[in-house]
Amino acid sequence: MTETKDLLQDEEFLKIRRLNSAEANKRHSVTYDNVILPQESMEVSPRSSTTSLVEPVESTEGVESTEAERVAGKQEQEEEYPVDAHMQKYLSHLKSKSRSRFHRKDASKYVSFFGDVSFDPRPTLLDSAINVPFQTTFKGPVLEKQLKNLQLTKTKTKATVKTTVKTTEKTDKADAPPGEKLESNFSGIYVFAWMFLGWIAIRCCTDYYASYGSAWNKLEIVQYMTTDLFTIAMLDLAMFLCTFFVVFVHWLVKKRIINWKWTGFVAVSIFELAFIPVTFPIYVYYFDFNWVTRIFLFLHSVVFVMKSHSFAFYNGYLWDIKQELEYSSKQLQKYKESLSPETREILQKSCDFCLFELNYQTKDNDFPNNISCSNFFMFCLFPVLVYQINYPRTSRIRWRYVLEKVCAIIGTIFLMMVTAQFFMHPVAMRCIQFHNTPTFGGWIPATQEWFHLLFDMIPGFTVLYMLTFYMIWDALLNCVAELTRFADRYFYGDWWNCVSFEEFSRIWNVPVHKFLLRHVYHSSMGALHLSKSQATLFTFFLSAVFHEMAMFAIFRRVRGYLFMFQLSQFVWTALSNTKFLRARPQLSNVVFSFGVCSGPSIIMTLYLTL
């Protein structure tokens, strides 16, 4: 089957229009029928193939023979390597993909779709910097010993070597000799900080016991944490089991019952788009859950959707790659002698890239053997949101380390409950009273009271914010990683040293950042053809929407405060990139730390009072 095209609509043949001269012997129309398009023609002008009639226009003399020779030459080349319409469209598709598949500077190097996210055996930050040194190399104070050794070295040097010191010129250099550095271990401060928080919690508990006795079950936070546990567990289990729908879809594709490109893709997309809208009203409105339960179920449902999406579209991409490999290989074998050298090269590159992509993570080519309920279940257990066939694993489970993290989880939850009950709950009740008093004696007293509430909220909420971060991203994720022998423990970076919120958004929650990088940022650039700046804006916008939904799950009302604060990070990023702040990283870190300590408290106070 050949593709027909009116050459008069192609830029290559625009000069032919001048053949229709207004002089004698003019031609009223020039029509070409049944033209076999070469590959170059499809790439330059991929318009629909039709036969048309063009009105005669003015032309110059002497052009007819030149254009006729060119057309004849092209027709001879096309007849030598005929390509059908479907193949022509397929080749055009491959050429459009080549820009993202090959390195810009070296066309022989492939660029994998999976190269944006990597997993390597890495320890978590607090373990490598504090916990491990404290348990393995801690020997008490070391600074005094270093000073004594340094003094002893200087004394021996003076006794053996005579030196001349010039003191006539002043200098600003430090007195310490170059290469000599004093080091100390700060593990003791880490222990002291936890001891300090523990004694505060014990003091609060003893004060409550002296006033109310052993009626611990009457505490509001305790009631929040201990009610409807069975219902919550069953609902969470039901949502988890629903995510196996994506495994069922890919199993159907594996058995060639359906095709991923159309049926599978649409089915998974509908499932993901409907998952949160269907489950959200159940735990927010249908069940009379407290706000702690609502936010837990919402965040867990988002995790389920993210894991399902990563599993589904990772394997969906490999289905497309596998199908491309089969088709390109088939065409190379079928038309081995009749294809042009350029077409043969395109198809061969397609086969090479597909093999490279299928073997990118493992030489065993486990796809599609990885599509199973057990594989998806194991992925759901891993403390990661981006799916791939293989992950770095440890050789064994360190049960002492697991016990340490379990104790850290229990102890941190206890500290969080004490902080929430005795430091935040009274302020929250005052905020609700403020919200229920519309006038509050005028706007000036109301403003003063609002700032008073904010200042009371900041200390307790900042402590709760830090404890929540430690409990989830260090204690909980490391405990799960150890139980599953997941070797990459890089769940967060040193975000406390950030000088901009742009850095903070990347390293404070590495699992979510990796998911957004692959499945939102890069996918939006590929599927929606967005630029880098547009993809960045789209990623932040989507993240802000889910943050606002989390606030709705807690307060059951839409205010948009957190949504606006999320998007305001663009402003803070622009300010941190100014020449003034870039030259002063210490000041930038102070500004960042002020925002981290005050921002969450401002948002919480706004939602409670306004």
From Swiss-Prot:
It is an enzyme of class 2 (transferase). It is found in: Endoplasmic reticulum membrane. It catalyses: lanosterol + an acyl-CoA = lanosteryl ester + CoA. InterPro entries: MBOAT_fam, Oat_ACAT_DAG_ARE. GO terms for molecular function: ergosterol O-acyltransferase activity; lanosterol O-acyltransferase activity. GO terms for cellular component: endoplasmic reticulum; endoplasmic reticulum membrane. GO terms for biological process: ergosterol metabolic process; sterol metabolic process. It comes from the Eukaryota. Residues 41-81 are annotated as: Disordered. The modification Phosphoserine is found at residues 21, 45. A motif (FYXDWWN motif) lies at residues 491-497. The active site is at 547. Sterol O-acyltransferase that catalyzes the formation of stery esters. This is Sterol O-acyltransferase 1.
